[in-house]
Design a protein with these regions (language model features):
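Sec-dependent N-terminal signal peptides of Gram-positive bacterial secreted proteins and lipoproteins
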Residues: 2-30
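Short alpha-helical segments used as structural interaction elements across diverse proteins
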Residues: 3-4, 66, 296
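N-terminal pre-first-transmembrane soluble regions of secretory-pathway and organelle membrane proteins
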Residues: 7, 21, 25, 39-40, ...
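Hydrophobic alpha-helical membrane context
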Residues: 18-19, 81, 303
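Generic detector of short alpha-helix boundary/capping microenvironments
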Residues: 19, 37-38, 60-61, 102, ...
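Active-site-adjacent loops and short helices of periplasmic peptidoglycan-processing enzymes
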Residues: 26-197, 207-210
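Domain-terminus/edge residues, biased toward the C-terminal soluble/receptor-binding domains
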Residues: 179-180, 187-193, 197-449
C-alpha cells in the first residue's frame, strides 16, 4: 500500500509539469529574457520567416486601434494588383466620409463633401497621417460601403490565418466617433480587437506580399494636395522614423494606433543589413502607468534592441545534414531497397549569438506518403517525405512561427528509385524468403544454448 501511494504521489507531481510543457506557448520567454516592457502585450518576429523571437501575452485579444488600417492597406494593394481599381481612380466623398473628416478630435485630412480625390491621395493620407475619413473612402471604393468592406476584412483575415479578431470598421476607431453611421450589425461603442500575434501576422503578410507599402510608411511628412486651397501638412505618427524625435536606425514603418481601449500601441518594422524585424506593442505605459507616445516607442526600441543585439542570422544546419538513424527510408518494390533523404536547403535562422552550434533536427515522416512504413516505388528525386523540426541540443524551446507552425523545413528524397521489374521482384521475394528462414533458424539455435 505504501509503495502504491508513493507511485500515485509521483504521478500527481509529474502530470502538472507535463501539462505545462505540452501547452507552453511557443512565443513564451524565460525569466532571463524579461525585457521589462510595460505593455499589455508584445511580440517580436523575423519579418522574413515569421519566426517568433519574443512574446509577452501575445495571444490575449486586445484593442488595436488604427493598426487595423494595415488590413485596409492589404486589401487595397490586392485590388490594385488584380486590376479591380487603379491609383488614379477617383473617389467621390460620401456624406459619411465627409462627416468623419470634419471631426477635429481625429487624425484626418479634411475632405470636401462631393469632391473627387484619387485613390493614391487617400492612401498616402492613410499611410502617412492615419487619416480616418480617407480610410473610409478607400473602404467604400473597394466594397461599396464600409458594412460590406468589413466582410472583406473578415474573409481576408481568415485566409491569412489570423486568430481571435473582430473587425467592426475599417479605421480602428471606436464606433462612437462615426457620427451615428457605423457599419450595420455593429454596436455604437464597438471597436476592433485582435491579439498581438495576429497583428504581427498581418504585418508579416503585408510586408511579404506588398513591400511597396514601405514607400509611403517611411515618409516622415508630406503636404496633402500641395498647391491647392485644401493643402494640409501630414506628419507621420511614427516618431521612430529617421529625423523624428524617437528615431531608430532602420525603421521605415509601419502603423501606430491610439484609442482609449487600445492605449498607445504600435506595429513597427526595422531593417539592418539583411535582417528585418517586426515589433508589436499593445497599450504601452510609462513608469507611472500613463500611456504616451514615448512609452510605446520606448517599448518598441527595447524589442528592436533585443532582436538586433542578441540574435544573428546563422546557418545552423548544412544542406547535407544527415538524420541520425533516419539517413534513408525503405522502398517497397524498388530497384533499391531504400532511398536517401535530406534537407532541401541549408537551414538559416535567427538564433542567439551564443547558440549557433547548438541546434539539430528531428525527422518527422509524412505518413500519408508511406504504406506500412515504406515508400512505394517508383520514387522521384525531390519527393517530399516529411518535415525536419528544429530542436535545441540543450532541450531549450525553439520558438515557432507567428502563423502557429513549428520551426521546420521540408525533407525530400535525394535520389530517384525506379520500380523493379518482375525478375528483380522475384529474386527479392526469394531472397526475403530464405532470409526469413535463416533468421528463424539462428533464433532456434540460439535458443538451444
Amino acid at each position: 500500500l505504501n509503495h502504491k501511494l508513493k507511485r500515485i504521489l509521483a504521478i500527481l507531481m509529474i502530470v502538472p509539469v507535463l501539462m505545462m510543457t505540452i501547452f507552453a506557448a511557443p512565443g513564451a520567454v524565460s525569466a532571463e529574457e524579461d525585457l521589462g516592457l510595460r505593455v499589455d502585450a508584445a511580440i517580436l518576429i523575423d519579418a522574413d520567416t515569421g519566426q517568433i523571437l519574443y512574446g509577452k501575452n501575445e495571444d490575449a485579444t486586445l484593442g488595436i486601434a488604427s493598426m487595423s488600417k494595415m488590413m485596409t492597406e492589404y486589401l487595397l494593394f490586392e485590388a490594385i494588383e488584380e486590376g479591380r481599381i487603379t491609383w488614379e481612380q477617383e473617389y467621390t466623398v460620401s456624406d459619411y466620409a465627409y462627416a468623419v473628416s470634419q471631426d477635429r478630435r481625429l487624425s484626418n485630412v479634411p475632405l470636401r463633401n462631393g469632391e473627387k480625390y484619387t485613390i493614391r491621395e487617400l492612401y498616402e493620407a492613410l499611410a502617412i497621417y492615419s487619416a480616418n475619413a480617407a480610410t473610409i473612402g478607400i473602404a467604400e471604393t473597394l466594397a461599396g460601403s464600409e458594412t460590406k468592406f468589413i466582410k472583406l476584412m473578415d474573409e481576408k483575415a481568415q485566409e491569412l490565418g489570423l486568430k481571435d479578431y473582430k473587425f467592426v470598421n475599417s479605421t480602428g476607431l471606436n464606433n462612437s466617433y462615426l457620427q451615428g453611421m457605423h457599419p450595420q450589425g455593429t454596436g455604437e461603442n464597438d471597436e476592433n480587437v485582435m491579439p498581438a500575434k495576429s497583428v504581427a501576422l498581418l504585418a508579416y503578410h503585408l510586408l511579404k506580399d506588398y513591400p511597396e507599402v514601405l514607400e509611403a510608411t517611411s515618409v516622415p511628412k508630406k503636404v496633402f494636395r500641395e498647391g491647392t486651397s485644401d493643402a494640409i501638412q501630414m506628419d507621420n505618427w511614427n516618431f521612430m522614423l529617421p529625423g523624428l524625435v524617437y528615431e531608430y536606425e532602420g525603421v521605415d514603418g509601419l502603423k501606430t494606433g491610439t484609442t482609449d481601449l487600445a492605449g498607445h500601441s504600435f506595429t513597427g518594422t526595422a531593417k539592418r543589413d539583411d535582417t528585418r524585424l517586426i515589433a508589436v506593442v499593445l497599450k504601452a505605459v510609462d513608469e507611472k502607468g500613463n500611456g504616451s507616445y514615448k512609452a510605446r516607442f520606448d517599448a518598441a526600441r527595447s524589442l528592436f534592441d533585443y532582436g538586433f543585439n542578441q540574435f544573428v542570422k546563422a546557418e545552423i544546419l548544412p544542406a547535407d545534414h544527415a538524420f541520425k538513424g533516419n539517413e534513408a527510408l525503405p522502398v517497397n518494390k524498388g530497384e533499391e531497397k531504400e532511398v536517401k533523404i535530406g534537407l532541401t536547403e541549408p537551414v538559416t535562422m535567427l538564433v542567439k549569438s551564443s547558440d549557433q552550434d547548438k541546434y539539430t533536427a528531428e525527422f518527422i515522416a509524412d505518413e500519408s506518403k508511406m504504406k506500412d512504413g515504406e515508400l512505394e516505388a517508383p520514387v522521384k528525386e525531390g519527393t517530399s517525405v516529411g518535415k525536419a523540426n528544429i530542436v535545441h541540443a540543450d532541450g531549450q524551446p525553439v520558438y515557432g512561427n507567428v502563423d502557429g507552425t513549428p520551426a521546420s523545413i521540408d525533407v525530400v528524397t535525394k535520389e530517384a528509385v525506379e520500380k523493379a521489374g518482375w525478375f528483380s521482384l522475384t529474386l527479392q521475394a526469394i531472397g526475403d524468403f530464405f532470409a526469413g528462414i535463416w533468421d528463424k533458424s539462428t533464433g532456434w539455435v540460439k535458443g538451444l544454448f
